[in-house]
Amino acid sequence: MYDLGNIAVMGSGSWATAIAKMLMEKVEHLHWYMRRQDAIDDFKRLEHNPSYLTSVHFDVKRITFYSDINEVVKQCQTLVFVMPSPYLKNHLKKLKQRLHDKFIITAIKGIVPDENLVCSEFFRQVYNVPDENLAVLGGPSHAEEVALGRLTYLTVGCSDQDKARSMAETLVSGYVKTKTSGDVIGIEYASVLKNVYAIAAGICNGLKYGDNFQSVLMSNAVQEMNRFLRAVYPIDRQVYDSVYLGDLLVTGYSNFSRNRVFGTMIGKGYSVKSAQIEMEMIAEGFYGTKCMKDINRMYHVNMPILDAVYNILYERISPAIEIKLLTDSFR
């Protein structure tokens, strides 16, 4: 079994907090990077994250906090990146330590803007991290349900299955079940696309489309996802597995889904800016929509749902008009 060494959670949001909760079920001591020192000070004083999942309390004596990214990278072998993809480059700007010999696990369900790269590709191309040191954590897993200890299924994807199994075993608990996969790229793209489709589901919800149509939308979404995954990385995969379809369904239907909430606001008539201001949280699918539209220009996959969401968010076409056109294309 691969020795993970010191494990660091890299991020301070709700999913980072949920992952920290899962890890502390198994590890004796956790390392945790947060950019803001004042957030660390509040965390130590309150013994919980002051901004996210405040009901989850931690034994802070078992946590070493860092606001210096170079220090945490120096001290840890396994780095779990859990921050919004638009902020990843900014967090790494101050990094002087090399990452090529670290085990990098990305739990970021988004694409790095401007680069148009899923996070594993970003670490591979920009930081020369080899495939065997890159992993992805995916699956239907709302942070709020992890906080409540509700049963959750996760998948660790890595080309090195020994490393994947080590991380998967570290996450297992009474309420977390895990498995492994070698489909790193497929899992990452699926996790990006499901956010786009959740926005579509939210827009339809805001426009008062019912459950009958929502099911048709999700059925077409999984077909669209499968077409893209086959084009970008053609391996034998079961797209109906929980890490693909399961993640799509929970993000598209759940009230915990910030992408669905964002889409619902757009469907009700909010502008993109006003919806973002009112939510006060990042809807990864907004950024993912533009990135996926750009990426698909290379592959020319038929993706009418992606196109519709892009037209609504970026071309400012009326949601009612665009979704009506989409409904006419479904059978």
Name these PLM-found stretches:
Residues 66-74, 78-149, 167-169:
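Rossmann-like NAD(P)(H) cofactor-binding subdomain of soluble oxidoreductases
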Residues 56-64, 130-133, 174-176, 301:
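A short helix-to-beta-strand connector/capping loop
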Residues 74-75, 193, 245:
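Alpha-helix C-terminal capping/helix-to-coil transition sites in glycosyltransferase folds
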